[in-house]
């Protein structure tokens, strides 16, 4: 039988329905994204009060979640394993020494075999094509825990963090299922345009949050990602706007939140000297925020790991910094996503 004619075996006469995957925030409607954030917030409050929501108790009992990580990880691994265990499931970690995607066997073979033995695949990979191919041939939900292009779990955690700090200040908070009460907020991204930014900007557009991006010339958001961000405006009553500049001070003007990330991602080590030179004027400092005219109560975020050239100690360890709650929120984001895509089979409510 030709490979493209293969169908998963079932005890019946027909193949199972195609599972729903989470590969990018672009896969979600505004209401679905807002619901994932709200659920994460609710579960965080309940579980940290030494209680477990009834809908999560044993929700993954008897289920195995395969964690296929071809890239090293700290927060993603700990948050995902912790989420699975809290929900009563079994996390199975498959690192790069256990499995090499597309090396010893095709991605097709890997996806078909592993998905026949587990209830979900959480994958942290390199090229987006790897996660897309895993999902294409998987018989169970695939959740993107990071690829070179997107990082949806980080975006959920980031908006949970922003929601906790700013939503109560908005008069529109909680008035519509597709709203997080953040309309009109401004995020300034200062640094490299990367996978974290891409999903953050898509989410912001859906939530009515404006994003101003400052990168050195030559490090801007790729045109095909800009198109995807603009597409996220469709069907949104008051979508957020995206602007780009090469001047950090321009980006941070009137910013509520200033965000940065590593300047040298995994796989870019050979570009270190070039990148350090290109980004030398993009360090987040109190002086930068003051020169640019950020709002008086601006907050700082960074998904970690952090390097001293990216942000000053003064900002990173200040009361403005949300980096440690942001990191913790990866756990609650993972719980929310696992419930939606594994327990509820893609129905987000």
From Swiss-Prot:
Domain of life: Eukaryota
Disulfide bond residue pairs: none
Pfam families (alphabetical): OTCace, OTCace_N
GO cellular component: mitochondrial matrix
Active-site residue list: 303
GO BP, sorted A to Z: arginine biosynthetic process via ornithine; citrulline biosynthetic process; L-arginine biosynthetic process
GO MF annotation terms: amino acid binding; ornithine carbamoyltransferase activity
Entry EC number(s): 2.1.3.3
Enzyme class label: transferase
InterPro entries: Asp/Orn_carbamoyltranf_P-bd, Asp/Orn_carbamoylTrfase, Asp/Orn_carbamoylTrfase_sf, Asp_carbamoyltransf_Asp/Orn-bd, Orn/put_carbamltrans
Chain positions recorded as L-ornithine binding sites: 195, 261, 265-266
Catalytic activity: carbamoyl phosphate + L-ornithine = L-citrulline + phosphate + H(+)
Binding site for carbamoyl phosphate: 73-76, 124, 151, 154, 303-304, 330
Ranges in a coiled coil: none
UniProt pathway annotation: Amino-acid biosynthesis; L-arginine biosynthesis; L-arginine from L-ornithine and carbamoyl phosphate: step 1/3
Protein family per UniProt: Belongs to the aspartate/ornithine carbamoyltransferase superfamily. OTCase family.
Entry protein name: Ornithine carbamoyltransferase, mitochondrial
Species annotation: Coccidioides immitis (strain RS)
